[in-house]
């Protein structure tokens, strides 16, 4: 039987159909190592998020500044090629930030916004309260109400 919409009958003042939606977008930050990329993009893939990887490599001074007040860390929010991350087109359209490792965690925590949660993979080596959900292996030896522990490293090769 044809749906009421196709039969010409109006089913309400604003009928809602299941329209295809674009996949949520994930802005992924971390050092440009194959294992870190694989873990972060593997999580994005399994969550059915469209992920864009942005390599970062903040200095020690930048990581200290990023752990402080927002105004102090703002100049340090740069990708590995020097571009400002706060105005990056992929960040502006993202629904979530995935960070990986300590350096990625420092950048990710600084990019956290009310409408854009941050999900780090691995121990971010800073206060876990700065993150919405953390995904860490048992060997990372962290725990808390916002920590999801897994047995092995994440990747996009096998089902969870």
Language-model segments: residues:
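N-terminal pre-catalytic "stem/leader" segment of glycosyltransferase-like enzymes
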Residues: 2-81
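Structural motif
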Residues: 25, 95-96, 117, 133
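Short, well-ordered alpha-helical microsegments
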Residues: 36-37, 104-108, 127-128
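Glycosyltransferases and closely related glycan-assembly transferases
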Residues: 40, 106-119
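Short, well-structured alpha-helical segments in soluble
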Residues: 78-93
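Short beta-strand elements of ligand-binding domains
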Residues: 99-100, 118-123, 135-138
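Alpha-helix capping/helix-boundary segments
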Residues: 103-104, 141
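A nucleotide-sugar donor-handling region in carbohydrate enzymes
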Residues: 128-160
């Amino acid at each position: 039987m044809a749906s009421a919409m196709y039969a010409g009958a109006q089913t309400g003042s604003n009928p809602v159909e299941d329209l295809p939606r674009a996949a949520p977008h994930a802005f992924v930050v971390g050092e440009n190592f194959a294992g870190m990329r694989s873990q972060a993009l593997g999580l994005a893939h399994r969550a059915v998020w469209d992920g864009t990887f942005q390599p970062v490599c903040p200095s020690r001074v930048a990581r200290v500044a990023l752990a402080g007040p927002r105004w102090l860390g703002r100049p340090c929010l740069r990708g590995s090629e020097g571009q400002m991350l706060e105005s990056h087109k992929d960040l502006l359209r993202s629904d979530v930030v995935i960070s990986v490792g300590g350096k990625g965690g420092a950048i990710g925590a600084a990019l956290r916004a009310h409408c854009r949660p941050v999900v780090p993979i691995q121990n971010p080596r800073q206060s876990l309260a700065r993150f919405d959900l953390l995904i860490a292996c048992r060997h990372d030896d962290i725990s808390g109400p916002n920590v999801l522990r897994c047995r092995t490293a994440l990747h996009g090769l096998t089902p969870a």
